[in-house]
Amino acid sequence: MEFHNGGHVSGIGGFLVSLTSRMKPHTLAVTPALIFAITVATIGSFQFGYNTGVINAPETIIKEFINKTLTDKANAPPSEVLLTNLWSLSVAIFSVGGMIGSFSVGLFVNRFGRRNSMLIVNLLAATGGCLMGLCKIAESVEMLILGRLVIGLFCGLCTGFVPMYIGEISPTALRGAFGTLNQLGIVIGILVAQIFGLELILGSEELWPVLLGFTILPAILQSAALPCCPESPRFLLINRKKEENATRILQRLWGTQDVSQDIQEMKDESARMSQEKQVTVLELFRVSSYRQPIIISIVLQLSQQLSGINAVFYYSTGIFKDAGVQQPIYATISAGVVNTIFTLLSLFLVERAGRRTLHMIGLGGMAFCSTLMTVSLLLKNHYNGMSFVCIGAILVFVACFEIGPGPIPWFIVAELFSQGPRPAAMAVAGCSNWTSNFLVGLLFPSAAYYLGAYVFIIFTGFLITFLAFTFFKVPETRGRTFEDITRAFEGQAHGADRSGKDGVMGMNSIEPAKETTTNV
């Protein structure tokens, strides 16, 4: 299939229509039904971003709440060590919940489907929001910690559900662009949490429980809207054998009556699945055709978290303060705005430049910026302009993250696997993401204490390593169906078994589908 773009298109809508029109000879539309379904799904991504960023701004106030509550109960103030440990637990237990939730993705999606799973787990969001929102009234530190654990479980599940659902309902030529919307939801959630966390909005001593409990509202909104969204047609046909329903949903989502080629691809995959036993987590590592894609998936997730991005956002206020910024919270919000803008840019680029290229550009830019951050922090006391260099390096660091390492690892996992192993793969990849997230949050303060400005050199080393791995090991998936990608890995695994060599270079040499002339 050779495609080549012609005509001028402006705006996000025009860009998406341009991509869609290149899928097949007949014209497809970006339908309201497709946009609505993806938008509703990304509310789960928003929840993940919001609850990741919401705990940072009210840190001092929440510590005071913990101190006062424990003092009133014990008639004596807690030790500084206990206070610090309880605060750290309140932050870190969110990631523990995320690890458990992400590893449980397959238990839900195979039993209830993609859409219904998103609907059911909103009960966790409501429960976690209530626990956190009422902890001050109840004078209970335990409710705060338990609420963070429950909302972490919810967010961990969402990190598997949302990319999987979006990938399965999106046309092949739009899969990357729409997959990026998952990351856009996350960064908007982080930005909203930063803004709401300002003392003049919800970050005050009186309103911080409302700030934490706000997560109930998106859960209610998504629960009301999800029944209007279709189930994944791939799930209906491949897992439930409901071909007629799947065909009807594809026609409505993609705006065309001719979906026979896509239905046939799903039927072929379904036939192959019926000859295989159910894929477990262990099978992903035992079967040669799954082993390489799961390793790629894990490393790409690690490249996101070990890039240092969460260290920047978790401790951004302190970093800006160390850099000499008088109002560091506003500088942190500026980083959140940059985060959002460049995620939108990635939406435009991912189907043109490709996943692999953008990921390498992002990693390379971040490696340079993390080195520059180290230099500027070391020299800021000697040269006045170094504070501005540090801020600039952080903003460009964030921009590079959102070009590649931010959005791509989430949706590329769904692309690398067929319907059978996909839930298990999403669980493993998501758990590796949350685990590395937890370790960065746990270890970064100590590393920063002992290493000072040199701490970001550690991330530079990781970034260079991940850049090399992406160059040598990660294939390009742009413009390829799930079936194409699966067969390529299977053929590569068989070739590697026969030759005794790693066939990954063959995958890297596979060129994505080129464009053919179409008029929009």
From Swiss-Prot:
Q: Where is this region: Disordered?
A: 493-520
Can you tell which superkingdom this protein's organism belongs to? Eukaryota
What tissue specificity does the UniProt entry give?
Mainly expressed in testis. Also expressed in small intestine, liver and kidney.
Q: Which reaction does it catalyse?
A: D-glucose(out) = D-glucose(in); L-dehydroascorbate(out) = L-dehydroascorbate(in)
Misc. remarks from the entry: GLUT14 is a recent (less than 5 M year old) duplication of GLUT3.
Similarity comment: family membership: Belongs to the major facilitator superfamily. Sugar transporter (TC 2.A.1.1) family. Glucose transporter subfamily.
Protein name in UniProt: Solute carrier family 2, facilitated glucose transporter member 14
The gene name on file is SLC2A14
